[in-house]
Amino acid sequence: TLDGFQAYGGSKNAVVRWMRKLAPVWAKDGVRINAVAPGTTQTPLLQAGLDDPLWGDAIRNFPVPLGGFADPQQIASALAFFLGEESSFCTGSVLFVDGGTDALMRPDKF
């Protein structure tokens, strides 16, 4: 069986693969589909994790090259970009709003 981390990572990959497969199909009808991949974001759920004696240190030490955690408004701004005219030529794209974590941790080869 999958543990929570494997299931979480697998679900993120599934969403991206689904979105990228649909992008060229929907583009024929003028429909764009993109994704925002948020990093660790300041939410009540994150705060509960930070307060947890078992998980708090691991969360605080999670590698974020820019440091700290995202503010929810930063994630909302990325979503607003994809909804606006500025992204009218974007489809099948993933915008990472994670302080550089993906750039740091993504392997060069899969």
Question: Where does each model-flagged region fall?
Answer:
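Short, small/polar-rich loop/turn modules that mediate ligand/substrate recognition or access, typified
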Residues: 27, 32, 90-92
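Short C-terminal tail/terminal secondary-structure segment
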Residues: 91-110
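Catalytic loop of short-chain dehydrogenase/reductase
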Residues: 1-28, 40
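A conserved structural motif in NAD(P)-dependent oxidoreductases
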Residues: 63-75, 86
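Short-chain dehydrogenase/reductase
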Residues: 19-20, 76-79, 83
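A glycine/serine/threonine-rich, flexible loop-to-helix segment
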Residues: 1, 41-64, 104-110
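Conserved SDR Rossmann-fold cofactor-binding beta-strand/turn motif
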Residues: 32-42, 83, 96-98
